[in-house]
Amino acid sequence: MVKIFALPANEGDFIWVAYGENEVYSHILIDGGTDECGEEFASIISIIDERKEKIEALVLTHVDYDHIQGALEGICRISNDILDRTVKRIYFNTYQGIHRNLKGTGEILESSVCIEDQIRVNQNYKEYGVKDGIKFGELLSEKGLKDRLVDCVVYGQQAVLPNGATMRFISPGEKELIKFANEWEKYERENEYVQYASNLEMVKKNLADLMQEKLLSDSSPNNASPIAFIFEYHSIKLAFLGDAKPSVCLQGIKKINDADHFEVDLLKLSHHGSRSNTSDSLLKTIRTNNYLLSTNGHHKKVPSKVVLSHLLKNAGKKDINLYCNYDWYNTEYHERYFTIEDRRAFIDTKKLSLYLLDDQALEIKDGCYIYGEYGMF
């Protein structure tokens, strides 16, 4: 059995995967949302520890605030003993890891400023007494987690987990990591790219018409570097794309799959449904009719309606299921995201079904369930 919890994380990602049999689970945590999610992140670690189970992989996909900050705030709240018992591996690409592992494959500029040193825990917890925050590396050292860190992840690698589960990485590539190490950009929460914020005019158009609109390409070095992977357990396959670029994921898929396409049971849309992080080629290659969207709508910036139109365009005769952890289509757009024609052609006919996740299980396939809250677990 696999349980997926796509937890509300404001504009970010915060995903918990539990897999196992007979109510005994292994766990994967993927990102931790914004800093407001820190308490819940800590609570989940405590729940797993109380069950005497393990976090096989804590994946921090990349440096952006809306993915990493809640995880770091949560780690701060948990005792070293619990973390030592519970967390087995942390996957996060750092400058030091990139430099150490890839310096022979491309020109990596020497820098006195490491990316990871710019990531700080903002809150002033008593056990540290640090006013300006504690650096990422220092946090791992003080929490006894430094030796659990896998700090250079590239596509083609694989993590073998207990009970026959695997994580096969499809992003980033070596070239992208080297570029990221040399050109990384500090994430500004309120300063997004123009194409990321161009959704308002598009929602006035019909989905059928938007199928002719082109998808864009994300130029951010930060979003060339996120960790993306395929999780497999028995017959269940899940694709978690973080904020990864589709062109990089396509290269990664070629590293793990010889066929021209790859079937999965669920795909977490990259970058919260941004127009710049999905492509027709990706949708044709990683095939599914079940999509997960993690966003609160982020001030009407995501998801791009063009992306939804292309999900439908590439679906063929299949109906599309879109699982959401916020009802952004109502709250952000006052129920005007979909036009009358959209509702007639796609919503009413169930060609596009939207599901708002809560603590009740929705079955994706036999043995695989998705939630938006974890309740009593």
Task: Describe each PLM feature range.
Residues 16-17, 67-73, 101-103, 250-253, ...:
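A short acidic (Asp/Glu
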Residues 25-26, 39-91, 258-276, 285-292:
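Active-site metal-binding motif and surrounding structural segment of the metallo-beta-lactamase
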Residues 2, 10-13, 254-261, 285, ...:
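C-terminal regulatory/interaction regions
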Residues 5-7, 28, 59, 91, ...:
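Hydrophobic/aromatic beta-strand patches that form the interior of the parallel beta-sheet core
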Residues 1-51, 221-247:
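Conserved beta-strand hairpin/beta-sheet module of binuclear metal-dependent hydrolase folds
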Residues 11-13, 35-36, 63-68, 97, ...:
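Active-site environment of divalent metal-dependent phosphoester hydrolases
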Residues 78-237, 320-325, 337-377:
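Flexible, acidic/histidine-containing loops and adjacent segments that form or flank the divalent-metal
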Residues 27, 239-309, 313:
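Extended hydrophobic/aromatic segments used for targeting, binding, or gating
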